[in-house]
Protein backbone atom coordinates (compact mmCIF):
# COMPACT_ATOMS: atom_id res chain seq x y z
CA UNK A 1 0.00 0.00 0.00
CA UNK A 2 1.42 3.35 -1.10
CA UNK A 3 0.85 7.05 -0.56
CA UNK A 4 2.49 10.14 -2.03
CA UNK A 5 4.77 12.34 0.08
CA UNK A 6 7.15 15.22 -0.48
CA UNK A 7 10.01 12.72 -0.55
CA UNK A 8 8.33 10.39 -3.01
CA UNK A 9 6.05 7.38 -2.52
CA UNK A 10 5.87 5.92 0.97
CA UNK A 11 5.08 2.28 1.73
CA UNK A 12 2.99 1.07 4.66
CA UNK A 13 4.78 -1.59 6.71
CA UNK A 14 3.61 -3.58 9.71
CA UNK A 15 5.82 -5.35 12.25
CA UNK A 16 4.86 -8.97 12.82
CA UNK A 17 4.45 -10.11 16.41
CA UNK A 18 7.66 -11.51 17.88
CA UNK A 19 5.92 -14.81 18.67
CA UNK A 20 4.79 -15.37 15.08
CA UNK A 21 6.28 -18.62 13.81
CA UNK A 22 7.13 -17.24 10.36
CA UNK A 23 9.12 -14.00 10.13
CA UNK A 24 8.32 -12.99 13.71
CA UNK A 25 9.48 -9.42 14.44
CA UNK A 26 9.98 -8.56 10.77
CA UNK A 27 8.56 -5.52 8.99
CA UNK A 28 6.40 -6.68 6.09
CA UNK A 29 3.50 -5.64 3.89
CA UNK A 30 0.01 -6.53 5.17
CA UNK A 31 -1.04 -9.93 3.88
CA UNK A 32 -1.92 -13.52 4.62
CA UNK A 33 -3.43 -16.68 3.25
CA UNK A 34 -6.51 -17.31 1.11
CA UNK A 35 -9.55 -18.52 3.08
CA UNK A 36 -12.41 -20.66 1.79
CA UNK A 37 -14.82 -17.71 2.19
CA UNK A 38 -12.70 -15.66 -0.24
CA UNK A 39 -14.11 -17.81 -3.08
CA UNK A 40 -17.78 -17.37 -2.28
CA UNK A 41 -20.21 -15.50 -4.56
CA UNK A 42 -17.76 -12.78 -5.47
CA UNK A 43 -19.75 -11.35 -8.40
CA UNK A 44 -22.51 -10.40 -5.96
CA UNK A 45 -20.34 -8.09 -3.84
CA UNK A 46 -17.09 -7.41 -5.72
CA UNK A 47 -16.18 -5.13 -8.61
CA UNK A 48 -13.25 -6.01 -10.82
CA UNK A 49 -13.57 -9.80 -11.01
CA UNK A 50 -12.71 -9.73 -14.72
CA UNK A 51 -9.67 -7.57 -13.92
CA UNK A 52 -8.62 -10.05 -11.23
CA UNK A 53 -8.90 -13.06 -13.53
CA UNK A 54 -6.90 -11.26 -16.23
CA UNK A 55 -4.08 -10.44 -13.80
CA UNK A 56 -3.62 -14.08 -12.77
CA UNK A 57 -4.09 -15.96 -16.00
CA UNK A 58 -2.05 -18.91 -14.72
CA UNK A 59 -4.87 -19.70 -12.26
CA UNK A 60 -8.52 -20.70 -12.75
CA UNK A 61 -10.62 -17.49 -12.70
CA UNK A 62 -12.27 -18.33 -9.37
CA UNK A 63 -8.89 -18.84 -7.71
CA UNK A 64 -7.52 -15.64 -9.25
CA UNK A 65 -10.43 -13.66 -7.84
CA UNK A 66 -10.00 -15.32 -4.43
CA UNK A 67 -6.38 -14.14 -4.28
CA UNK A 68 -7.58 -10.56 -4.77
CA UNK A 69 -10.35 -10.91 -2.18
CA UNK A 70 -7.83 -12.33 0.30
CA UNK A 71 -5.49 -9.39 -0.32
CA UNK A 72 -8.31 -6.91 0.34
CA UNK A 73 -9.49 -8.82 3.42
CA UNK A 74 -6.01 -9.01 4.92
CA UNK A 75 -5.54 -5.30 4.27
CA UNK A 76 -8.69 -4.63 6.27
CA UNK A 77 -7.73 -7.02 9.06
CA UNK A 78 -4.09 -5.98 9.43
CA UNK A 79 -4.20 -2.30 8.42
CA UNK A 80 -7.83 -1.25 8.88
CA UNK A 81 -8.09 -0.10 5.25
CA UNK A 82 -11.21 -1.10 3.33
CA UNK A 83 -10.90 -1.14 -0.46
CA UNK A 84 -14.61 -0.69 -1.10
CA UNK A 85 -16.74 1.83 -2.98
CA UNK A 86 -20.27 3.13 -2.53
CA UNK A 87 -22.99 3.35 -5.19
CA UNK A 88 -21.37 6.53 -6.58
CA UNK A 89 -18.07 4.62 -6.91
CA UNK A 90 -16.42 6.67 -4.17
CA UNK A 91 -14.12 4.89 -1.77
CA UNK A 92 -15.75 4.53 1.62
CA UNK A 93 -14.72 7.21 4.10
CA UNK A 94 -13.74 6.01 7.56
CA UNK A 95 -13.44 9.47 9.12
CA UNK A 96 -15.55 10.63 12.04
CA UNK A 97 -15.64 9.12 15.51
CA UNK A 98 -18.86 7.13 15.00
CA UNK A 99 -17.79 5.72 11.64
CA UNK A 100 -14.30 4.91 12.88
CA UNK A 101 -15.67 3.11 15.94
CA UNK A 102 -18.18 1.14 13.87
CA UNK A 103 -15.60 -0.05 11.38
CA UNK A 104 -13.18 -0.84 14.20
CA UNK A 105 -15.82 -3.24 15.51
CA UNK A 106 -16.26 -4.66 12.01
CA UNK A 107 -12.53 -5.11 11.65
CA UNK A 108 -12.29 -6.97 14.95
CA UNK A 109 -15.26 -9.13 13.96
CA UNK A 110 -13.70 -10.08 10.62
CA UNK A 111 -10.35 -10.70 12.29
CA UNK A 112 -12.00 -12.91 14.89
CA UNK A 113 -14.07 -14.84 12.37
CA UNK A 114 -17.44 -13.60 13.69
CA UNK A 115 -18.24 -11.76 10.43
CA UNK A 116 -17.04 -12.31 6.90
CA UNK A 117 -15.75 -9.40 4.85
CA UNK A 118 -18.69 -9.96 2.52
CA UNK A 119 -21.11 -9.41 5.41
CA UNK A 120 -19.52 -6.05 6.22
CA UNK A 121 -19.41 -4.90 2.61
CA UNK A 122 -23.03 -5.83 1.91
CA UNK A 123 -24.26 -4.48 5.24
CA UNK A 124 -22.84 -1.06 4.34
CA UNK A 125 -24.12 -1.12 0.73
CA UNK A 126 -20.59 -1.22 -0.70
CA UNK A 127 -18.69 -3.14 -3.39
CA UNK A 128 -15.22 -4.54 -2.82
CA UNK A 129 -12.83 -2.83 -5.27
CA UNK A 130 -10.69 -5.66 -6.64
CA UNK A 131 -9.76 -3.42 -9.57
CA UNK A 132 -7.80 -1.23 -7.13
CA UNK A 133 -5.27 -4.04 -6.68
CA UNK A 134 -2.40 -4.26 -9.19
CA UNK A 135 -0.38 -7.47 -9.32
CA UNK A 136 3.37 -6.81 -9.39
CA UNK A 137 5.25 -9.82 -8.01
CA UNK A 138 5.12 -13.59 -7.46
CA UNK A 139 7.31 -15.32 -4.86
CA UNK A 140 7.57 -18.99 -3.90
CA UNK A 141 9.44 -20.26 -0.83
CA UNK A 142 12.58 -22.35 -1.38
CA UNK A 143 11.82 -26.06 -1.85
CA UNK A 144 13.78 -26.96 1.30
CA UNK A 145 11.71 -24.66 3.54
CA UNK A 146 9.40 -26.52 5.93
CA UNK A 147 6.69 -23.88 5.34
CA UNK A 148 5.69 -23.61 1.71
CA UNK A 149 4.09 -20.40 0.43
CA UNK A 150 3.07 -19.36 -3.06
CA UNK A 151 2.58 -15.62 -2.70
CA UNK A 152 1.28 -12.95 -5.08
CA UNK A 153 2.07 -9.35 -4.18
CA UNK A 154 -0.37 -6.58 -5.06
CA UNK A 155 0.04 -2.82 -5.06
CA UNK A 156 -2.63 -0.25 -4.21
CA UNK A 157 -2.95 3.40 -3.23
CA UNK A 158 -4.34 4.10 0.23
CA UNK A 159 -7.90 5.42 -0.24
CA UNK A 160 -8.64 9.02 0.77
CA UNK A 161 -10.21 9.50 4.20
CA UNK A 162 -8.74 6.28 5.58
CA UNK A 163 -5.87 6.05 8.07
CA UNK A 164 -4.16 2.65 8.30
CA UNK A 165 -3.03 1.23 11.63
CA UNK A 166 -1.70 -2.14 12.80
CA UNK A 167 -4.06 -4.53 14.58
CA UNK A 168 -2.13 -4.96 17.88
CA UNK A 169 -2.66 -8.71 17.56
CA UNK A 170 -0.73 -10.24 14.68
CA UNK A 171 1.14 -6.97 14.19
CA UNK A 172 2.55 -4.70 16.90
CA UNK A 173 3.79 -1.63 15.05
CA UNK A 174 3.19 0.14 11.75
CA UNK A 175 4.83 2.95 9.84
CA UNK A 176 4.98 4.83 6.55
CA UNK A 177 8.49 4.89 5.08
CA UNK A 178 9.99 5.69 1.73
CA UNK A 179 11.64 2.60 0.22
CA UNK A 180 15.07 4.19 0.68
CA UNK A 181 14.39 4.96 4.35
CA UNK A 182 13.16 1.43 5.03
CA UNK A 183 16.26 -0.08 3.40
CA UNK A 184 18.50 2.29 5.37
CA UNK A 185 16.83 1.27 8.64
CA UNK A 186 17.35 -2.38 7.74
CA UNK A 187 21.04 -1.79 6.99
CA UNK A 188 21.35 -0.01 10.36
CA UNK A 189 19.63 -3.00 12.04
CA UNK A 190 16.73 -0.84 13.22
CA UNK A 191 14.18 -3.07 11.48
CA UNK A 192 14.20 -6.54 9.91
CA UNK A 193 13.21 -6.79 6.25
CA UNK A 194 12.67 -10.26 4.73
CA UNK A 195 14.29 -10.66 1.28
CA UNK A 196 11.02 -10.32 -0.72
CA UNK A 197 10.19 -7.09 1.14
CA UNK A 198 13.72 -5.72 0.64
CA UNK A 199 13.67 -6.59 -3.07
CA UNK A 200 10.27 -4.95 -3.56
CA UNK A 201 11.41 -1.78 -1.80
CA UNK A 202 14.51 -1.66 -3.97
CA UNK A 203 12.31 -1.93 -7.08
CA UNK A 204 10.10 0.93 -5.85
CA UNK A 205 12.99 3.17 -4.83
CA UNK A 206 13.30 5.08 -8.11
CA UNK A 207 9.67 6.19 -8.52
CA UNK A 208 8.72 9.80 -7.87
CA UNK A 209 4.96 9.30 -7.49
CA UNK A 210 2.48 6.55 -6.69
CA UNK A 211 1.07 6.92 -10.21
CA UNK A 212 4.52 6.12 -11.62
CA UNK A 213 4.81 3.01 -9.46
CA UNK A 214 1.34 1.78 -10.39
CA UNK A 215 1.98 2.37 -14.09
CA UNK A 216 5.17 0.30 -13.85
CA UNK A 217 3.36 -2.49 -12.02
CA UNK A 218 0.60 -2.65 -14.64
CA UNK A 219 3.03 -3.19 -17.49
CA UNK A 220 5.86 -5.23 -15.98
CA UNK A 221 6.44 -8.90 -16.75
CA UNK A 222 5.52 -10.97 -13.71
CA UNK A 223 8.26 -13.48 -12.94
CA UNK A 224 7.94 -16.41 -10.58
CA UNK A 225 10.80 -15.94 -8.13
CA UNK A 226 11.82 -18.98 -6.13
CA UNK A 227 14.95 -18.38 -4.05
CA UNK A 228 17.37 -21.18 -3.22
CA UNK A 229 18.72 -21.81 0.27
CA UNK A 230 22.43 -22.44 0.76
CA UNK A 231 24.56 -23.12 3.83
CA UNK A 232 28.20 -22.07 3.43
CA UNK A 233 30.69 -22.16 6.31
CA UNK A 234 27.79 -22.32 8.74
CA UNK A 235 26.15 -19.21 7.28
CA UNK A 236 22.61 -19.34 5.90
CA UNK A 237 22.25 -17.68 2.50
CA UNK A 238 19.19 -17.02 0.36
CA UNK A 239 19.92 -16.79 -3.37
CA UNK A 240 17.57 -15.19 -5.88
CA UNK A 241 17.28 -16.29 -9.51
CA UNK A 242 20.07 -14.47 -11.33
CA UNK A 243 22.67 -15.16 -8.65
CA UNK A 244 25.57 -17.29 -9.98
CA UNK A 245 25.05 -19.78 -7.14
CA UNK A 246 21.33 -20.17 -7.85
CA UNK A 247 20.22 -23.17 -9.97
CA UNK A 248 18.82 -20.59 -12.42
CA UNK A 249 21.73 -18.11 -12.66
CA UNK A 250 20.45 -16.35 -15.78
CA UNK A 251 17.81 -13.70 -15.13
CA UNK A 252 17.93 -10.47 -17.12
CA UNK A 253 15.52 -8.84 -14.66
CA UNK A 254 17.31 -9.90 -11.49
CA UNK A 255 17.42 -7.16 -8.82
CA UNK A 256 20.61 -5.41 -7.76
CA UNK A 257 21.03 -7.63 -4.70
CA UNK A 258 20.62 -11.33 -5.45
CA UNK A 259 22.11 -12.74 -2.26
CA UNK A 260 20.88 -12.41 1.34
CA UNK A 261 22.89 -13.57 4.35
CA UNK A 262 21.18 -14.23 7.70
CA UNK A 263 23.15 -12.96 10.72
CA UNK A 264 21.55 -12.57 14.16
CA UNK A 265 18.02 -12.61 12.69
CA UNK A 266 18.86 -9.82 10.24
CA UNK A 267 19.05 -10.37 6.50
CA UNK A 268 22.01 -8.60 4.89
CA UNK A 269 21.65 -7.98 1.15
CA UNK A 270 24.64 -8.45 -1.11
CA UNK A 271 25.19 -7.68 -4.78
CA UNK A 272 26.94 -10.67 -6.32
CA UNK A 273 29.23 -10.87 -9.33
CA UNK A 274 26.91 -12.51 -11.83
CA UNK A 275 29.76 -13.55 -14.11
CA UNK A 276 31.35 -15.91 -11.62
CA UNK A 277 30.25 -17.79 -8.48
Labelled PLM ranges:
Residues 1-277:
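N-terminal leader/linker segments that precede catalytic domains of diphosphate-processing enzymes
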Amino acid sequence: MLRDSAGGPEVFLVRRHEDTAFMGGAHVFPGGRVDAADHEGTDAWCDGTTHAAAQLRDLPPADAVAYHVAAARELFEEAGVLLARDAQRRFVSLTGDDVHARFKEYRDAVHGGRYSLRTIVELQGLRLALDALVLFSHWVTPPVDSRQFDTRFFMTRVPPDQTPAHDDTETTHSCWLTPAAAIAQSINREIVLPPPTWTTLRELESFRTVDDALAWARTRRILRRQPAMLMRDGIRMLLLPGDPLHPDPFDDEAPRETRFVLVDRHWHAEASDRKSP
